[in-house]
Structure formats: C-alpha cells, structure tokens
Amino acid sequence: MPIAYANLELLQRDDFADAAQWHHEGAGEIKLLPEGGLRLHCFGSRQGAEGCMAFFRPTLPDHIAIEYDIIVHSHGGLVINYLAIRGLQGEDLIADLAKLPPRTGIMADYYANRTGLQSYHISFSRFDDDGRHTGTSNWRRNPGCRLIGHGSDPCKELKRRYSLRLVKDAGHCQLFVDGNFAHGFIDWDHARPIPDTGKFGFRLIGSDVMADVFALRVYRVPPNMSVWHICEE
C-alpha cells in the first residue's frame, strides 16, 4: 500500500552541467550529454562482474525522496540504485576509500560482509546479459544481499523516458514510476542498525547496458511513524 510523503525541502539537485558531483568506479564509462544529462554505459562485462558504478558525492540524510528521469537504451543488463551506502563503522564510501577494502566494481564489493558496507539497493530494467527479462524488480539489504521486497518491473521499455521517485523513511522504502506506485518494503529486521545515511548511486551491469539520467533532485520528507502501526494492524 503506498503511503504519501510530501517534499518539504530541496536538499540537492544536479542538472548535469558537469560531472563534478559524481564518482565513477568499476568498468564502463560515464559522460555528459549536450542537452544536460549523464550517460552511463557498461559494456563487455557480465552480471556479477565489474559494473559501471556512479555515486553521487554528497552524503544524504535519512527521510528523503530522490527523483530523476532515466532512458535505457539497451537491454543487455540491468540498472541498480543504491540508497544510504556507507561503511558499517560510518566510513564515507568515497572520502574514506583508503580505510575500506579495495573495490574493483564487482557486485560482491558492495554487499559482501568482507567489504564492510551497508545499504539498500533496488534493481529495475532487469534483463540478463542476453537481453531476456528476469521477471521482477527487487529490493535488497546489505551486507548480505538479502531480498526484502520485490514487485513487477515498471521500466521495461527501451528509449522511453521514465520519471522515478525513490522514497526512504528509515526502513520503509517505496518506488514510484511516472507518478504511479510500483512497490516497496518495510524492513522489520533490527538485528543490526538499518541503513540510514550515506551515498546514492547507480550500477549498470551486463554485456551492454546504457542509460541516460536527467534532472536529479533530492528532497527532505517527513518521517512517518504511523507506517509501522498501520502494518501491524
């Protein structure tokens, strides 16, 4: 069931006049588009191997909505967004690279216990290396890559411009596409602290997957404690 969160305050924006706010690691390339956008391209790889990683440099707080537009140009892989990715001891994903285990851009670098990172991530436009759709769009929690939510993939079409809105309110996350609720989750596992603050990022992974990102906005939204009570009824 979708729960409405109003945008209270604009915290960050990027219209991609330059790429100064983005950190690239792994494979592939990122480059600016003349009309104002960021192109991410992973090629010559395979799922699980080195991906095209792009992380937004500002550290984002909890209780936020992230909005952007995306056009996927090829179906030889999938797109992942990371929310609140940081070290388990509070390390900054980018500034504290030297304090964290080295990363080459393989998938396990961002979920394995050995790398000491926590986050939520969501996959969409979810095709395999040969261009076959894999069935769903998944939410996972890291470390551990634990499945905590899933639903129908709302971004299957090539060359179509989609408007995405990701809402994070502590352990409650939602995905909206073109103004419509797609799916979300509530994370009831408090065995360790839930992912809270950190970086937002992209992972493109596959044999050939390219996407253009436009008009990134990050808003503060109000915490909603009633979510937990509604779901207990």
Please annotate each region the language model reported.
Residues 1-82, 99, 154-156, 172, ...:
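Low-complexity, Ser/Thr/Pro/Gly-rich disordered linker/stalk regions
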Residues 45-138:
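Secretory/extracellular carbohydrate-interaction modules
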Residues 68, 160-169, 173-177:
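Short tryptophan-centered beta-strand motifs in secreted/extracellular beta-sheet-rich domains
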Residues 74, 168-170, 206:
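A generic beta-sheet turn/junction motif
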Residues 137-163:
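Short, aromatic/His-centered strand-loop micro-motif at the edge of beta-sheets
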Residues 176-184:
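Short strand-turn-strand beta-turns centered on an Asx-Gly dipeptide
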Residues 186-214:
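Flexible glycan-contacting loops in extracellular carbohydrate-active proteins
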Residues 210-224:
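Exposed low-complexity, polar/acidic, P/S/T/G-rich flexible segments that act as propeptides
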